[in-house]
């Protein structure tokens, strides 16, 4: 497995891309995609934090694990976890139609999510982003950058 610091940097970079895409989509008619990208951005920030504590996982619902490992680091942990959990609860709904149960109407994310849903998701992501991104930047700045095979420094 790769170095946990490099894994953290990779998650931070990819989370940054997702967050910037969410910023572009915010306020457009693409509500489901705004939610999907905010959700992905926050998941990657949480995974960046977890990697720094030696935890690398493919799981998606990480708010409880994050709380357990970082409780002492954030005085607003309850609020942080509420925002992370709010995004985790969407699951795959922003990206895929749900049609398994005939007794329920088919869920079509691009049709069924609204502007208010996207705004709430963005607000949650923004809160988490403003708390975790500076934390990660500060911690990762204490580690030397590793050169890739192409000779470029990783952020």
Describe each region flagged by the PLM.
Residues 1-155:
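Terminal alpha-helical segments
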């Amino acid at each position: 497995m790769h170095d946990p610091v490099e894994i953290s940097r990779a998650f931070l970079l990819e989370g940054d891309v997702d967050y910037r895409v969410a910023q572009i989509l915010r306020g457009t008619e693409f509500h489901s995609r705004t939610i999907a990208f905010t959700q992905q951005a926050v998941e990657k920030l949480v995974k960046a934090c977890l990697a720094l504590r030696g935890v690398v996982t493919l799981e998606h619902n990480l708010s409880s694990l994050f709380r357990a490992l970082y409780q002492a680091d954030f005085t607003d942990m309850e609020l942080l976890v509420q925002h992370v959990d709010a995004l985790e609860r969407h699951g795959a709904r922003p990206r895929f139609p749900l049609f398994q149960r005939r007794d329920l109407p088919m869920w079509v994310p691009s049709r069924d999510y609204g502007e208010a849903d996207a705004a709430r998701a963005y607000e949650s992501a923004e809160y988490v982003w403003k708390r975790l991104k500076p934390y990660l930047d500060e911690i990762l700045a204490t580690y030397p950058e590793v050169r890739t095979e192409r000779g470029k420094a990783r952020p």
